[in-house]
């Protein structure tokens, strides 16, 4: 049995009942060409999986009214908002709809309830984040806490997941600055 969330890395390998629980709290939304799904600086409200159509992820470079830098063109099956789903931080990029279609929306509030009630989901998300963080270049794994991350031995709490997301966001910002300069 396949679901639209099977392609999301931190949901891979979850048992079917857990996937179905997550799917039960999602909503399908129509998206219109030329509109933004969300904008850089908006409050994060959840994760979006592109079911049909196309979207473009971009950031504003420099001052208001300045140019934009395209980070990615998204096709059906791809997703945005995974960090915001967990940490609730403001959106770090904007997403423009370039071809009308549909997205599957997973609200952050509903997902938090799923994680509270399904430890297997919380563990899968935490393991995925540990894997992402441990794969970052230029990070030294010498402290006891860093070793826990590297060994995926982190308690799957929302607080720990937010910390892992923060590390990823900081790394992404530093990478963007290095690419700019």
Each model region followed by its residue ranges:
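Intrinsically disordered, low-complexity charged/polar segments
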Residues: 157-181
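A small-molecule sensor/coupling module
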Residues: 18-21, 90-92, 109-160, 164
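Short beta-strand His + acidic residue motifs that chelate non-heme Fe in jelly-roll/DSBH
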Residues: 57-58, 82-83, 93-97, 113-114
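Short acidic-glycine-tyrosine-enriched beta hairpin
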Residues: 63-80
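Short aromatic/basic micro-patch
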Residues: 47, 73, 105
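Regulatory nucleotide-sensing modules
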Residues: 5-61
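A short hydrophobic beta-strand segment most commonly corresponding to one strand
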Residues: 101-106, 110
């Amino acid at each position: 049995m396949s679901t639209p969330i099977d392609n999301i890395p931190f949901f891979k390998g979850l048992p079917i009942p857990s996937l179905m629980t997550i799917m039960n709290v999602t909503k399908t939304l129509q998206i219109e060409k030329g509109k933004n799904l969300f904008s850089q600086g908006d409050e994060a409200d959840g994760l979006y999986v592109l079911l049909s159509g196309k979207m473009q992820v971009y950031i504003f470079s420099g001052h208001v009214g300045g140019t934009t830098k395209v980070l990615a063109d998204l096709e059906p099956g791809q997703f945005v908002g995974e960090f915001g789903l967990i940490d609730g931080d403001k959106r770090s990029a904007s997403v423009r709809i370039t071809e009308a279609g549909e997205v599957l929306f997973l609200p952050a509030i509903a997902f938090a309830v799923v994680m509270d009630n399904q430890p297997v989901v919380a563990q899968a998300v935490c393991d995925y984040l540990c894997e992402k963080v441990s794969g970052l270049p230029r990070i030294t794994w010498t402290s006891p806490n860093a070793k826990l991350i590297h060994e995926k031995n982190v308690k799957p709490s929302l607080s720990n997941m937010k910390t892992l997301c923060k590390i990823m966001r900081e790394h992404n910002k530093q990478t963007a600055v290095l690419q700019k300069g």
